[in-house]
């Protein structure tokens, strides 16, 4: 006689197979959903759908809606990351979006609208953020942006919204918008949490309300992000900021504040001493954050080795490295990555005499660089500027003339030299 085995299922383990859509949403695969899509397609208001559908993905982690949405958009817009995902393929994956916010933090808490935009900019996308509000003007602008996006094949509109306003479970969520049905004023949401909800149509006014929900982490409304590839660019292939540098990195924020305060001080009378002082101060602030993208270690960069570039990038890497090392900045720094960071620094004209001097020298070199090196500097400037603007605590570069009495050292108080010189190891 056979024995029957009894298996017990834990009563504490709660799990779900998807969620039913609320009445506010129309399932994409329903008869009505198909009808709405067909009519939108005939009117040319679903062009971007095909690019998005070809890269439609399910978020890898419960809190990865923002990352997965961005990966979907990057691949849909055919952005070459010029990084290998799985050999030999170059393709965007969530694990490759390792700037702005630590991946471990995102896995736990997700990202907000500002962080999403930061990641987009660091990956060569034009990113325009519109925070939600309930005004008719916002709804009109929303509709215009949506129509422009869905009728194109190179612009994507992403919504950061509150699910609960749509009658769904959960709160903050990201997903791209793929089609618009004009007669019913409904938009197709390509929900990246496909394990929870399928793609669905929703009234534009309803989604507008969901965009107005305040994100508790930023105290700002959610909203929209218009994304488009910056044409004629390539990603950073030689230099960059280390992966741990992100908008929550207080060390980086502190370094930026210290550097900005240094720039406010009076320059030294001797030009060579002033140049050396500025370079040493910058190195003190940012050498720990600078990285040569082709090297595994700081020592390798010091040895001027570019052997780890991929074959198709090798010549470009060598050219960029060579041009940076021919500058006066590289004569001071042991790492060309720090020199590149200084040359690419987003100096604001008129910020201070010291800032203008060092900024003008950096600009002189940039004007002499090849197209490859200039692209590298422009991309690095974008990365730096984006991280500065998003840093917590906020790092604000005030381009207006600062209050000299509160922020600036006075020569007559410290002999004939800038007080900040005492803080820099020459």
UniProtKB/Swiss-Prot annotation:
It comes from the Eukaryota. InterPro entries: Papain-like_cys_pep_sf (IPR038765), PCS-like (IPR040409), PCS_N (IPR007719), PCS_N_sf (IPR038156). Expressed in hypodermis, pharyngeal grinder, pharyngeal-intestinal valve, body wall and vulval muscles, and coelomocytes. Expressed in posterior pharyngeal cells and anal valve. Keywords: Acyltransferase, Cadmium, Metal-binding, Transferase. Residues 11-232 form the Peptidase C83 domain. It is an enzyme of class 2 (transferase). It catalyses: [Glu(-Cys)](n)-Gly + glutathione + H(+) = [Glu(-Cys)](n+1)-Gly + glycine. The active site is at 65, 173, 191. Gene3D superfamilies: Phytochelatin synthase, N-terminal domain. Requires cadmium for activity. Induction: Induced by zinc oxide nanoparticles in intestinal cells. However, not induced by zinc or cadmium. Disruption phenotype: RNAi-mediated knockdown causes hypersensitivity to Cd(2+), specifically causes a reduction in growth, impairs development and reduces fertility. GO terms for molecular function: glutathione gamma-glutamylcysteinyltransferase activity; metal ion binding. Its EC number is 2.3.2.15. GO terms for biological process: cellular detoxification of cadmium ion; detoxification of cadmium ion; detoxification of copper ion; detoxification of mercury ion; detoxification of zinc ion; phytochelatin biosynthetic process. Belongs to the phytochelatin synthase family. Involved in the synthesis of phytochelatins, which are heavy metal binding proteins required for the detoxification of heavy metals such as cadmium, arsenic and copper. This is Glutathione gamma-glutamylcysteinyltransferase.
């Amino acid at each position: 006689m056979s024995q029957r085995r009894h298996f017990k299922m834990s009563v504490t383990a709660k799990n779900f197979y998807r969620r039913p859509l609320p009445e506010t949403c129309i399932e994409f695969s329903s008869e009505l959903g198909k009808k709405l899509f067909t009519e939108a397609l005939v009117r040319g208001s679903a062009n971007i759908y095909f690019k998005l559908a070809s890269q439609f993905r399910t978020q890898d982690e419960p809190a990865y809606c923002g990352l997965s949405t961005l990966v979907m958009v990057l691949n849909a817009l055919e952005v070459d990351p010029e990084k290998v995902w799985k050999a030999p393929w170059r393709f965007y994956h969530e694990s490759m979006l390792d700037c702005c916010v630590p991946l471990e933090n995102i896995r736990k808490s997700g990202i907000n609208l500002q962080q999403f935009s930061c990641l987009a900019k660091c990956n060569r996308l034009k990113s325009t953020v519109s925070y939600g509000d309930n005004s008719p003007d916002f709804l009109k602008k929303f509709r215009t942006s949506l129509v422009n996006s869905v009728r194109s094949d190179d612009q994507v509109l992403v919504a950061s919204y509150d699910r609960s306003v749509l009658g769904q479970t959960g709160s903050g969520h990201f997903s791209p918008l793929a089609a618009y049905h004009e007669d019913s004023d409904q938009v197709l949401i390509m929900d990246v949490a496909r394990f929870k909800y399928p793609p669905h149509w929703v009234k534009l006014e309803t989604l507008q309300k969901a965009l107005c929900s305040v994100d508790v982490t930023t105290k700002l409304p959610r909203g929209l992000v218009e994304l488009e590839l910056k044409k004629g660019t390539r990603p950073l292939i030689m230099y960059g900021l280390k992966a741990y540098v992100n908008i929550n990195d207080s060390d980086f924020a502190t370094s930026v504040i210290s550097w900005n305060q240094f720039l406010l001080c009076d320059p030294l009378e001797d030009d060579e001493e002033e140049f050396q002082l500025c370079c040493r101060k910058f190195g003190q602030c940012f050498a720990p954050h600078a990285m040569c993208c082709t090297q595994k270690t700081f020592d390798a960069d010091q040895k001027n080795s570019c052997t780890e570039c991929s074959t198709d990038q090798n010549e470009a890497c060598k050219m960029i490295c060579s041009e940076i090392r021919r500058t006066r900045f590289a004569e001071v720094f042991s790492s060309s990555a720090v020199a590149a960071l200084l040359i690419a620094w987003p100096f604001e004209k008129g910020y201070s005499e010291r800032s203008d001097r060092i900024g003008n020298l950096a600009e002189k070199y940039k004007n002499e660089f090849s197209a490859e090196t200039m692209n590298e500097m422009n991309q690095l400037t974008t990365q730096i500027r984006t991280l500065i603007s998003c840093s917590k605590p906020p790092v604000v570069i005030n381009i207006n003339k600062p209050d000299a009495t509160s922020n600036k050292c006075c020569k007559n108080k410290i002999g004939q030299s800038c007080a900040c010189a005492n803080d820099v190891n020459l």
